[in-house]
């Protein structure tokens, strides 16, 4: 398993649970606004974290954390993701999976076999703008399939989008709501200076007032 890092404690990544976060290495999207180039760009990859070391740590946290978040990068491109999830569940911990929805076959397998407890899918844009935002040619049918599987699953779920000023509009959000419904978690873009693309700045952040207007539009 290609594990780039582990965050030992998080109070926000798994809603309602104290968790640890496993970051997988590698992604099949190249979203310019991504703030984790070290997880996406091969030339920025660091050394892997040994899976054995991750589980040695998790065993010391039993009774102190309630769950583990598997994020990326994009976890579903990892061929041994199912095995990793099963090992975490064997410790009695809940599992939340973050995904970009590009691998519906893997998601269906995971959902149908009830391997995870929570799934969060990051939506990038209206479907007609997906490839432009993601920096690669995206198979939109796969995105639609993933949305369908997640929406119709009986596990906890979250659809979220990072709103970027100058890129996303109220009309874009309305288009996404037409597919998902109103239950979307809207996150504001935050400029870090460490994005995959070099065309982003503080100007791409919405103000608090603008975000409130965006949410209620």
Go through the PLM ranges and name each one.
Residues 6, 187-189, 216-217:
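Conserved beta-strand termini and adjacent loop/short-helix elements that scaffold enzyme active sites
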Residues 14-49:
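Canonical Radical SAM [4Fe-4S] cluster-binding loop centered on the CxxxCxxC motif
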Residues 37-68:
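Conserved alpha-helical substructure of the radical SAM core
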Residues 44-47, 73-74, 97:
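Short, flexible loop segments at the rims of nucleotide/cofactor-binding pockets, characterized by
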Residues 1-17:
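Short, charged low-complexity linear segments at domain edges
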Residues 23, 71-72:
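A secondary-structure boundary/capping signal
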Residues 202-217:
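Charged phosphate-binding loop/patch that engages nucleotide di/tri-phosphates or the phosphate backbone
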Residues 55-67, 76-203:
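Conserved AdoMet/S-adenosylmethionine-binding subsite of the radical SAM
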């Amino acid at each position: 398993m290609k594990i780039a890092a582990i965050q030992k404690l998080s109070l926000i990544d798994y809603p309602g649970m104290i968790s640890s976060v496993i970051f997988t290495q590698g992604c099949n999207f190249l979203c310019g606004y991504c703030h984790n180039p070290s997880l996406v760009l091969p030339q920025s990859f660091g050394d892997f974290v040994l899976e054995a070391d991750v589980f040695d740590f998790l065993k010391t946290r039993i009774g102190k954390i309630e769950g583990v978040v598997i994020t990326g990068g994009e976890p579903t491109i990892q061929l041994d993701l199912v095995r990793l999830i099963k090992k975490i569940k064997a410790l009695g911990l809940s599992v939340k999976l973050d995904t970009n929805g590009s691998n519906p076959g893997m998601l269906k397998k995971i959902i149908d076999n009830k391997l995870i407890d929570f799934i969060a899918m990051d939506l990038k844009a209206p479907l007609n703008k997906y490839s432009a935002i993601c920096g690669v040619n995206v198979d939109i049918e796969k995105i639609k399939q993933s949305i369908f599987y997640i929406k119709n699953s009986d596990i906890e779920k979250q659809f979220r989008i990072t709103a970027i000023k100058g890129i996303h509009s109220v009309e874009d959000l309305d288009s996404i709501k037409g597919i998902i419904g109103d239950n979307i978690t809207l996150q504001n873009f935050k400029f870090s200076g460490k994005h995959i693309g070099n065309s982003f700045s503080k100007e791409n952040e919405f103000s608090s007032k603008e975000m409130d207007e965006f949410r209620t539009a």
